[in-house]
From Swiss-Prot:
InterPro entries: aa-tRNA-synth_Ic, Rossmann-like_a/b/a_fold, Trp-tRNA-ligase, Trp-tRNA-ligase_bac-type, Trp-tRNA_synthetase, YegP-like_sf. GO terms for biological process: tryptophanyl-tRNA aminoacylation. The keyword Aminoacyl-tRNA synthetase applies. NCBIfam families: PRK12284.1 (NF008923), trpS (TIGR00233). Belongs to the class-I aminoacyl-tRNA synthetase family. Catalyzes the attachment of tryptophan to tRNA(Trp). This is Tryptophan--tRNA ligase. ATP binds at residues 10-12, 18-19, 155-157, 197, 204-208. HAMAP family: Trp_tRNA_synth_B (MF_00140_B). Homodimer. Keywords: Aminoacyl-tRNA synthetase, ATP-binding, Cytoplasm, Ligase, Nucleotide-binding, Protein biosynthesis.
Length: 449
């Protein structure tokens, strides 16, 4: 089976060593596998959320495109495109926006962090918050679901967005699928071995901290940047601790095991920091020198980059265009030439049943809610260690069968295989509780034609 992998980089800055080691290099390695279908894109719509400088965005798009190619991306093996060259993506974003719950978006980490920052500053909670920031998880869901990606490589801080894409995709399937699963449920791919590099000051290398080493800066500028890496004050001849050295962590990400072992040994034997930084520069210059020349050549040929990206967009749209037509048909945005069935020709009456919504708690555990057709919460599950366990339980409930419901004063619980798996809300009295039990049984009963 071929696995489709999708990843994008937001075009708001110049690529640095952290981008390369943490995202670009592992993605290029993965793209060479015979059983992988890779979709890589420049997330320039996302960039508009973070940056209002047109020249910076334009320059960043050019630099990131050139970086991917100079680093060895084979555009004949992958689909490489700009997000803004795929008009189906914003259209799908709107279709998904119309089924995305506001409560789901309220829980997005970036939005909550912005609100919390405003509250701490005694400002209006929504001060400076745009609809772009608030709803960008829907745009990210469209990026993923447009191509039915199986896996999305992300950092741990991005797991929530993949889970939100799943929630939104499930909701669309439930409302419009009529037995068909339009969207594959994507999985977040966490690469534990992928490097998170320290910046010049020891914090995570990030444009936000202004502590980056540009990937393809000139040899002179790279040497100057490396010389500014923070180290301790131990003199040459004094033993250094590699495990607490930002310089060693950086060296480790680019060296072979043999080179790394040698560098560690020399630090323990008292190698001076000045000489250690010189070796760091030599290692990077040898590894990146040829790619730097290719990068500079591509930067000088923007028309060639444009042609490559437009060809990639055509390739991507061969997937996106017919799929979006199916989705438009599903929601009722149909051509008037499409035959419309009426009730006299045997159209079945259908009712919208209950639906399951899964989510992840801040502590990493998984839960699901069972919501009635009108949105009322019928059940809230207990916590599960992983999403698979939660999915097994919700799938069992969807299969119908006798329910083990146990009344407890002003609420009831649901049991499976001798274990309590979900709780009802608290009710005003026993009558309301018993009515809710009947509603739950009806909601989980197999649908009849």
């Amino acid at each position: 089976m071929t696995t489709r992998i999708l990843t994008g980089i937001t075009t708001t800055g110049t690529p640095h060593l952290g981008n390369y080691a943490g995202a670009i290099r592992p993605a290029i390695v993965a793209s060479r596998q015979s059983d992988v279908d890779s979709f890589y894109f420049l997330a320039d719509y996302h960039a508009l959320i973070k940056c209002d400088d047109p020249l910076r965005i334009q320059r960043s798009r050019l630099e990131i495109a050139a970086t991917w190619l100079a680093a060895g991306l084979d555009v004949d093996r992958v689909t490489f495109y700009r997000q803004s060259d795929i008009p189906e993506i914003p259209e799908l974003t709107w279709l998904l926006t119309c089924v995305a719950a506001k409560g789901l978006l309220n829980r997005a980490h970036a939005y909550k962090a912005s609100v919390d920052k405003n509250v701490e500053s005694c400002e209006d909670p929504d001060a400076g918050i745009t609809m772009g920031l608030y709803s960008y998880p829907v745009l990210m869901a469209a990026d993923i679901l447009m191509f039915n990606a199986h896996q999305v490589p992300v950092g741990r801080d991005q797991i929530q967005h993949v889970e939100m894409a799943r929630d939104i995709g499930q909701r669309f399937n439930h409302l419009f699928g009529k037995g068909r699963e339009f969207f594959v449920m994507p999985e977040a791919l966490i690469e534990e071995s992928v490097a998170t590099l320290p910046g010049l000051d020891g914090r995570k290398m990030s444009k936000s901290y202004d502590n980056t080493i540009p990937l393809f800066s000139s040899a002179k500028d790279m040497k100057s940047a490396i010389s500014r890496i923070v180290t301790d004050s131990l003199a040459p001849g004094e033993a250094k601790d590699p495990d607490n050295s930002h310089l060693f962590t950086l060296y480790q990400a680019f060296s072979t095991p043999e080179q790394c072992a040698q560098f560690r040994s020399e630090l323990l034997q008292g190698l001076g920091w000045g000489e250690a930084k010189t070796r760091m520069f030599t290692l990077l210059d040898e590894q990146l020198g040829e790619a730097r020349e290719q990068y500079l050549s591509l930067i000088e040929r923007p028309a060639d980059l444009e042609d490559i990206l437009l060809a990639g967009a055509q390739k991507a749209r061969r997937v996106a265009t017919p799929f979006l037509e199916e989705l438009r048909e599903a929601v009722g945005l149909r051509s008037f030439r499409t035959a419309v069935q009426n009730a006299d020709t045997g159209k079945k009456k259908t009712t919208k049943g209950a639906r399951f919504v899964s989510f992840r708690e801040d502590d990493g555990s998984f839960r699901f809610r069972l919501l009635a057709a009108d949105g009322e919460q019928l059940l809230l599950s207990r916590t599960f260690a992983d999403g698979k366990a939660a999915g097994i339980v919700s799938k069992q409930l969807q299969q119908g069968g006798e329910l083990d419901l146990r009344s407890e004063a002003d609420r009831f619980t649901l049991w499976l295989n001798g274990e309590c798996v979900a709780d009802s809300p608290v009710f005003a009295d026993a009558t309301a509780r018993d009515n809710a039990v009947e509603t739950l049984k009806l909601a989980l009963a197999p649908q009849q034609d």
